Amino acid sequence: SPYNKDNTLVAIGYTYRALDGRPIWGSDGAVYIKKFPIDNYYLYEFQEAINEATYIVAHNAKFDLAWLREVGIECNNKVIDTMINEYVLNKGIRSKLSLDALSEKYKVIRKQSLLGDALSKGLNYSDMSEEDQKKYLYYDVMSTAEVFEKQQKRFKRSENKSLIPIRDLMCEFCS
């Protein structure tokens, strides 16, 4: 949590994706990762990427948005939370909503257990090697993007189209 004075933001990762076949700027499949402390130029560059986005996709978005606000990033975009998406698609029936569980369910790229391995050794994310941090963040970003794409396909099914306004309303509360 950014509200705990002992916690610090150590990295930001993001990618650009096209939605419904419409290309977007920078849609090159790359994952952009920057470790903290971040210079003002990178914050400006990241803010520009946020400003150009049609919307932001995140898993457990309230966590990410709190950190972005803490470092001065304004996010006035529509936010779509893959955790909320899944809750809505399951029509409120309890299920596992972690990114790892959804990655397994949708058979998409999964985060590696790099963070889990570090935590089991009493380390924090910031204690991991830069290479391991980048790997973890890459898989986190790509897992979220791929889960989102699978969820979008489910929302397009006739039996789920009525759920879209509910999803939008719930996601609006988190942004």
Language-model features: where?
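Conserved RNase H-like, two-metal-ion catalytic cores of nucleic-acid enzymes
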Residues: S1-S98
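Short alpha-helical "patches" and their helix-cap loops
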Residues: D28-I38, S103, R157-D168
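Exposed alpha-helical structural elements
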Residues: Y41-E45, S98-L102, L114, D132, ...
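Generic, well-ordered alpha-helical scaffold segments in large soluble proteins
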Residues: A49-A53, W67, V71, T82, ...
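Short helix/loop capping segments that flank catalytic or ligand/cofactor-binding pockets
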Residues: A66-W67, L97, K111-S113, E146
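Mixed-charge, glycine-rich, non-catalytic linkers/tails in nucleic-acid processing enzymes
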Residues: E74-N77, L119-S175
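Residue-level detector of short coil/turn "hinge" positions at structural boundaries
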Residues: C75, R110-K111
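Short alpha-helix plus adjacent loop in nuclease-associated cores
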Residues: V79-I109, D117-M128, D132-Q133, L137, ...
